[in-house]
């Protein structure tokens, strides 16, 4: 679980950013042809997404299907695939926003640092600072703003170890513990 939640977003961000910058001249050539820019970017995005999702399915999917072909394993695969696509989209967003390759890779690494590490610290700070107030809805909103945390919550609730997650786990078990709640979590990941 930790490998999927930490490494998959990092690889997706870095690979997506580097691919975009390395194929920048080819994209410019295609843009000079009578093709819509939306079509060009969507084709680039789909190509990178299919390649990285295939690599994820080969590297993680085969062992999970061999040794843990249950609901938890399939949820882990689904979350991993969604995180791959989400972070490739974020990589393309960062690469389109900056023309300099070094700055674009830096933006991608900062995005990963925020989503993987900093967001959890900000959540803890807010929860400890405002512990006297009801934070259920605010916690749900903050978790929805981070696809890595949302994926972690969906997989851990499927594993039924929410007692190990403390206050957040109890809250998530109440709000997302049912099949409808898990579907809402997957739906928010899809919106990402």
What role is predicted for each listed range?
Residues 2, 47-103, 107:
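Secretory targeting signals
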Residues 2-23, 52:
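Long, hydrophobic alpha-helical segments
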Residues 8-13, 42-43, 71-76, 180-184:
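Short alpha-helical transmembrane interface motifs in multi-pass membrane proteins
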Residues 12-16, 25-26, 89-90, 119-122, ...:
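Hydrophobic/aromatic residues in alpha-helical transmembrane segments
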Residues 13-33, 44-45:
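Transmembrane helix boundary and interhelical loop/hinge segments in multi-pass membrane proteins
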Residues 34-46, 50:
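Amphipathic cytosolic juxtamembrane alpha-helices at the membrane-cytosol interface
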Residues 105-115:
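Central hydrophobic cores of alpha-helical transmembrane segments
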Residues 119-191:
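Terminal transmembrane helical anchor/hairpin motif
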């Amino acid at each position: 679980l930790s490998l999927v939640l930490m490494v998959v977003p990092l690889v997706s961000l870095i690979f997506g950013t580097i691919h975009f910058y390395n194929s920048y001249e080819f994209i410019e050539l295609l843009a000079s042809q009578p093709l819509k820019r939306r079509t060009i970017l969507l084709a680039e995005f789909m190509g990178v997404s299919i390649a990285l999702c295939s690599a994820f399915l080969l590297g993680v999917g085969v062992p999970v299907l061999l040794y843990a072909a249950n609901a938890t394993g399939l949820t882990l695969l689904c979350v991993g695939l969604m995180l791959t696509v989400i972070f490739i989209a974020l990589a393309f967003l960062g690469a389109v926003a900056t023309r300099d390759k070094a700055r674009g890779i830096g933006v991608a690494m900062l995005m990963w640092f925020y989503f993987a590490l900093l967001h959890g610290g900000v959540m803890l700070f807010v929860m400890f600072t405002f512990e006297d107030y009801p934070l259920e809805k605010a916690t749900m909103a903050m978790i929805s703003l981070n696809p890595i945390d949302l994926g972690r919550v969906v997989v851990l609730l499927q594993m039924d170890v929410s007692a190990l997650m403390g206050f957040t786990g109890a809250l998530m078990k109440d709000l997302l513990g049912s099949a409808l709640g898990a579907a809402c979590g997957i739906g928010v990941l899809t919106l990402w």
